[in-house]
Amino acid sequence: MKALSKLHAKPGIWMTDVEKPECGYNDLLIKIKKTAICGTDVHIYKWDDWSQKTIPVPMVVGHEYVGEVAAMGDGVRGFEIGDRVSGEGHITCGHCRNCRAGRRHLCRNTYGVGVNRPGAFAEYLALPAENAFKLPDDVTDEMAAVFDPFGNAVHTALAFDLVGEDVLITGAGPIGIMAAAVARHVGARHVVITDVNEYRLDLARKMGVTRAVDVSKEKLSDVMTELGMKEGFDVGLEMSGVPSAFSQMLETMNHGGKIAMLGIPPENIAIDWNQVIFKGLVIKGIYGREMFETWYKMASLLQSGLDISPILTHEMPIDDFEKGFETMISGQSGKVILNWD
């Protein structure tokens, strides 16, 4: 079958012909319809330090997808041939304390689809059935293809109560922008997002943020004054991994504020702990999606009228995958969809 693989230990991803995966006793065999390019895939494409330490070569990559059930193992219940599905890319062990306590997203032995085992950039994907999510009919294939990053956004945005709160989001990448849309949808008062990429700040404006701020041209303190904010932000969503953005978040948080961190900063980031301690801030790390509460929330948010379609900026056939990666790397895009049909 056709697949995109990390074929060599150097920059690039290659179109390959690989064996169709076998469907195990508890697996679904999923015929892939659409995939999306993730920032993780870009890291793998560039072959950065993290990728060199993490990704086995050769291996099929990719983990954002939608497809149909083409075959089922004998032990599978609850699915039928033809069901539309997406799937949780974190495959957990089932026997550690967190798994047994129902906190599978905190499994200490997680394996990643397209990271530690063959991925979804292929005509077929074999996946444990317990990791598959059956999609409601009113969720489009395009939306379902980005459920993985949308889930990161939902998990982060809903980490703390947002109703009536002023929310600062640092980092207007696709996940940050989707988190901003979620925050507005669930009742936040002001949602302010910061970045230096004007293309993506414009996308955030289309998604309904109160203010999208280019911090290279505008002071966040001036925006807060403009909005009549006297006491700082109640909730912060750190999506950038940029140390200066996190420092600015700490400075502008209200006393008793809460911060959810999804962005991954460089090692040994300096933190002004006086801001954290004397303001009584709560900082929570966010990893992946809660299984499967986040997935049900994603579907419900879309069904209740949340529109994140502006984030889907490019769509192209799989044979144009090089163009897709170039578009993502340029920073002049939201999510890029690759069609396998």
Curated annotation (Swiss-Prot):
The keyword Zinc is annotated on this UniProt entry: yes
Site positions for Important for catalytic activity for the proton relay mechanism but does not participate directly in the coordination of zinc atom: D148
Gene3D superfamilies in alphabetical order: Medium-chain alcohol dehydrogenases, catalytic domain, NAD(P)-binding Rossmann-like Domain
Cell compartments where the protein resides: Cytoplasm
Cofactor needs: Zn(2+)
Alphabetized UniProt keyword annotations: Cytoplasm, Metal-binding, NAD, Oxidoreductase, Zinc
Catalysed conversion reaction: L-threonine + NAD(+) = (2S)-2-amino-3-oxobutanoate + NADH + H(+)
Cofactor, free-text remark: Binds 2 Zn(2+) ions per subunit.
Known partners and oligomeric status: Homotetramer.
Protein name: L-threonine 3-dehydrogenase
Gene name tied to this protein: tdh
